[in-house]
Amino acid sequence: MSYVDGILDKTKDRVHIVERDKDGNRVYRDYPAEYVLYYDDPKGKHQTIYRTPVTKFSSQSNAEFRKEMKIHSNKKLWEQDVNPIFRCLEKNYLVVDAPNLHLCFIDIESDFDEVRGYAPIDDPFNEITAVTVYLAWLGKLITVAVPPKSLTWESASAIAERFEDTFLFHTEAEMLDALLDMIDDADVISGWNSEGYDIPYIVGRVARALAKDDLRRLCLWNQMPKRRDFERYGKKSMTYDIVGRVHLDYMQLYRKYTYEERHSYALNAIGEYELGEQKIEYEGTLDQLYKQDFYKFLDYNRQDVRLLANLDAKLKFIDLANELAHDNTVLLPTTMGAVAITDQAIINAAHKQGLVVPGKKPYSKESVDIMGEDDDDGRAAGAYVAHPKVGIHKYIGAIDINSLYPSTIRALNMGPETIVGQIRPIMTDRYIAEKMKDRLVGKRMMKGPSFSAAWEGLFGSLEYSAVMNMERGTELTIDWEGVEEPTVHTADEVWRLVFESGQKWMLSANGTIFRYDFEGIIPGLLAYWYAERKVLQKKKKEATTKEDIAFWDKRQLVKKINLNSLYGALLNPGCRFHDFRIGQSTTLTGRTIAKHMDSFVNQCITGKYKYDGEAVVYGDTDSISSNSIIRTTKGNMTVEDLFSLGNITWGEGGKEYSRNDDIQICHLNTERNAAEYTNYNYVYRHKVSKKKYKVTDSDGHEVLVTEDHSIMVEQDGKLISKKPSELVVGDVVISL
């Protein structure tokens, strides 16, 4: 058995957990709450991730715990803020499979007031007229409704009978009472924009039509829904969080787990895009539909829920959130963020090694906007993107670095506990500030470049470059971790200190010095996730049934999300492992790797080690397959043909290489601006798990590309990027 949800009862110091067992039964469990803290103590028997001694205090009484915190308030405390629910889940459910959840998809329709119009969620003065739910564990689509006064009861009943499981009620109160009974065995309730509409509206109407005490029927453990104010896209709103029975807004799930931007997130647009299905169309207003065509009104409401159910049947986003929650021992709503789930994953990894993690650093949400455009303080330099060389290019190849940021963190053993020191970025800060200054152009003051734009052309801090160039005349200041007084050295002295002193140290492109005499918790966790994902991908490949393929695919995707989320969490001040130095070390070292990759590729082709050389037309991570036609001295052939004709072959790193020195290929000599035939270095092939698409143009030319390949298309006079699956007949392809 595994958990669905949990709450902390602070009055009784108990953690209440609700489970769903393998037979589909709901089971309630209680655990004593564990309040734990550690404090610095030279004689302590426990060890932090920094390898320093601490002493543990644990109590099942919150009052005793608070008292102990005050006693040790003059000392550094550790883990004093770890959520007792997560601590309970880690202890009791860490290796337990996620349960099969009872899912309920929901959509409501509300009445219209001729004077006041439709009601807002904070004052739901209009009654709910219809509710449709899909109870996935039963496979039933059920509608409850109050018919319009324009119909007799007999006429309305005759219409309702044309649908399966559709029931009419004389009053809204009777209908809502039936709704609460229908959802009683649901674990998760989900709708489209249900956070912003359905849930708060239902809460408001249940309180008015029935009684406030009936709101407890939305929750478990006799709890009441909890009001929560939130802001999204600059607009403030409110909703309610239900307890024990989890609510997940499917629109927000879709936005979170779909990595491409959509032109519209309306249910109709997403249903058409994902399923080829749409909402029921009607003329006039929904109120007119309700009163004038009750049949289509019911059909409209039911179709919305069908779309939701069909979307989840295809996308499985709730199952994905369920796996993520249980893989990291957090609650389902926690997966909608990025910080808390990453925090707990790292905590679990540290605890496996018997190590203690720090408490969170205090910060103000109002003072930090890490992704804001107006405030650049606290932001890290972003990724390097090469300027595209505009035009049509033939024989384009691509190199894709696997998991660049996670691999960079692992390569330099980056973690808060492995930082030795930081070269003060005095020159870099001055340079960036100067670049960002507003400038007077003619008689007009022009706003300076953004923080990101100011980093253009830089692949590391100026201090890092000085060290790597061993500049004797450049003085640098190092702030050492745990040492109050900084030291001053010349850049060449820093190089020798890092690389020739016998210390197991490394230097990031941010000028951060890391140690590697032991593996950091975060690099170790990333290595584990990466290796585990490879195993899961292999099991998916070996699976023979549709169910097994979906099972292993879901699990490997969890690891992918974990890998990709960790870097962003480290740059978020709300993360207990937040450290700007690690974030910028990751991006700048990633830039340096990309620079070397581009330079080396250009050197292989042109002989010049130059990152923006003639052979580099763009920086991207996609790949193109082997069917492009190549002109050779033996005639036109595909890359695959060229590989097959190789008379010199070898294997390396899971790839097969071939070469034939008797065949020359045609390429452009950019110095002479003329085509010429020369020998090629080699052709290699390797297995890929990505889907392939054949793109055929109007002249009959064909090119095979992978599913994640970006194709530039002209649409309405604009250049846009499409994936192969998004192409339609008639698209004007500018470049592949």
Region roles according to the model:
Residues 8, 14-19, 24-42, 86, ...:
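Conserved RNase H-like, two-metal-ion catalytic cores of nucleic-acid enzymes
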Residues 106, 248-249, 391-404, 530-533:
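Conserved catalytic palm subdomain of right-hand nucleotidyl-transferase polymerases, strongest
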Residues 91-99, 381-395, 608-609, 630, ...:
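A short acidic-Thr-Gly-centered motif at the start of a beta-strand
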Residues 144-262:
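Conserved DEDDh/DEDDy metal-dependent 3′-5′ exonuclease domain
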Residues 288-424, 428-442, 548-600, 605, ...:
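Common nucleic-acid-contacting/processivity interface regions adjacent to the catalytic cores
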Residues 184-202, 207, 250-342:
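Acidic, Mg2+-coordinating catalytic module of metal-dependent nucleases/exonucleases
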Residues 401-612, 623:
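Helical catalytic core of nucleic-acid polymerases
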Residues 623-736:
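HINT superfamily self-processing domains
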